[in-house]
């Protein structure tokens, strides 16, 4: 039995391969035991994810419909106004989200983007929501700017194992990703980092991904586990389906290796039935994205999730929020930013 409160950062792929070989029921039982030793019972953290700049990404991630290299029918969209971000954040809070995540399809943000991003962070924080961004690679200076503006979390996934990585992405290295995570951590922000399974990887690659995450100098506070969403036009549109039990085992092992991290049941939920999702929660998942879309891919709507939570007796993580003060700030912000046309620009243009 694994010590269910100890944090280890010296895991080996061989050890994790052995965990994948455990009987399913035994593994899930251990994962649930670990979860109960570290988190409140029957409580799930709820986040909302908004695409603040969609499409035309120069990267070649083979799973991604936002890459400019693939014909997926996705239209390029401008960086959206700060006021629209604030409006979406208010709606997210009203439906029970405690964290608001903003994603931009960039290899990395440019300095000209930063003032708009910093305003978004400040306005979301004024609502009493935790804030998170995923913008691509960050240098030290950019990480410091985001941190100083109050950004709570920064997401930058490792995607897969180091050994399989160049089969999926060639436009940035694995070390680039690790360097960004180091810059985020050094700035004082919390780290959100996970990966995708079902990319055609071997079992040892799933083990390798989890080992990389668990053995970081400090384990991520949030670990999203994504199941590939196959999108027509991407190189992985015809990838073989990943067995649901393998996916659930991946969740369980993430919980065992990172006992104090939130493990997020992320992309791919729209294709999962309620029973599969319930087993993921049993295996230690305690975070989801709420809302009918994750950037550009489908996600269960809020009503479906609410019904599932009621069936399972799951509660949403509470919001510590004083509405009167924040609501006034947000309402004023919407008026203020609507009056500033310069806060809307095409971040993908070369001008």
Swiss-Prot record:
UniProt xrefs under HAMAP family: BioB
PANTHER family attached to this UniProt entry: BIOTIN SYNTHASE, BIOTIN SYNTHASE, MITOCHONDRIAL
This protein's UniProt keywords: 2Fe-2S, 4Fe-4S, Biotin biosynthesis, Iron, Iron-sulfur, Metal-binding, S-adenosyl-L-methionine, Transferase
NCBIfam families tied to this protein: bioB
Record's keyword annotation contains Iron: yes
E.C. no: 2.8.1.6
Name of the protein in its database record: Biotin synthase
UniProt similarity note: Belongs to the radical SAM superfamily. Biotin synthase family.
GO terms of molecular function: 2 iron, 2 sulfur cluster binding; 4 iron, 4 sulfur cluster binding; biotin synthase activity; iron ion binding
Family annotation (InterPro entries): Aldolase_TIM (IPR013785), BATS_dom (IPR010722), Biotin_synth/BioAB (IPR002684), Biotin_synthase (IPR024177), Elp3/MiaA/NifB-like_rSAM (IPR006638), rSAM (IPR007197)
Function: Catalyzes the conversion of dethiobiotin (DTB) to biotin by the insertion of a sulfur atom into dethiobiotin via a radical-based mechanism.
Enzyme class: transferase
Listed cofactors: [4Fe-4S] cluster; [2Fe-2S] cluster
Regions that span the bilayer: none
Domain Radical SAM core span(s) in chain numbering: 42-269
Entry keyword Aminoacyl-tRNA synthetase: no
